[in-house]
Amino acid sequence: SETNATAPQNQLIPVPAGTVIQEKDREDELYGWDNEYGRHISDVSEFKASKHLVSNREFLEFIKDGGYRNQSYWTAEGWQWVQYKKVTAPGFWIQQEDGSYRFRSMLTVIDMPWSWPAETNYLEAKAFCNWKTEKMGLPIRLPSEEEWYRLLDYTQTPDVSDWEKAPGNLNLEDAASSVPVDKYAFKQGFYDVVGNVWQHTETPIRGLPGFQVHPLYDDFSTPTFDTKHNLIKGGSWISTGNEIIRSARYAFRRHFYQHAGFRYIASTAPIETPDDRYEIDPEVTPYCELHYGNEYFGIENYPEKLAQMALNHAQGRPKG
């Protein structure tokens, strides 16, 4: 059956250097969230990227090699999560008494679909890459957001407005699940450049140059500008609408599970980690302290003070 199919052997394919332009202006005809608007130009060095998304079969090798027991593969955050949750495999894997695995899909438990992309959180994907670095002797990691766009451009993957049909397992046009990682071919020899599952990146979200908070949803993006929310790209089988356009930028905490997997790259280029955190903005910090701290500039916690005033006012009043 398809779920028991043998997964393809993965390999690295070169991606030449190039300039990436991320931009969206206020006149764009497609809907967007505030973090999509602005303009960012980056020169991306050459790298190699895996032909396929990492399949369940490929991820199994990490598990069998003691990946969840070896602290050296994990970031400090990742190892803390492993210890706290006592994790031994991705969240949708169910280990049987004989040591084999089954898979919890959206609606039922099925035989392990070895050829489907491994659905992990960022922490697991990062640990896998560190393990792969040791095994391959190459600087293996997740792509940055800019490197993901460079692969998108190199494979000449069209934006949604130019589709006649979704180029991958997207928009609910194929299946109500993932499909094998070698089903949807793209140019230059790659598969699943978009679709099937979201793809983890190394990049914590921040606003693009020219970013402005939208007044109708002022806390959609800015609370995630804390270096703790990493971008996922490309959409999954169930992604529709804004989620599948080129400019989409969604980010989640690194321990969260989505319909997300990953592609790894080999690159010596450094990863730029933003430090423009929302909580240290001088205009925001007093507001946060006033609402969530104990006292700021001699002013008591505002919501707590209001609650205490309400309780005092209610003293002696009938309960009912």
What name fits each language-model region?
Residues 1-37, 42, 52, 67-242:
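Functional-site microenvironments in short loops/helix caps that host divalent-cation chemistry
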Residues 31, 36, 192-210, 216-320:
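C-terminal, surface-exposed recognition/capping segments
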Residues 55:
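Acidic-aromatic/histidine active-site loop/patch
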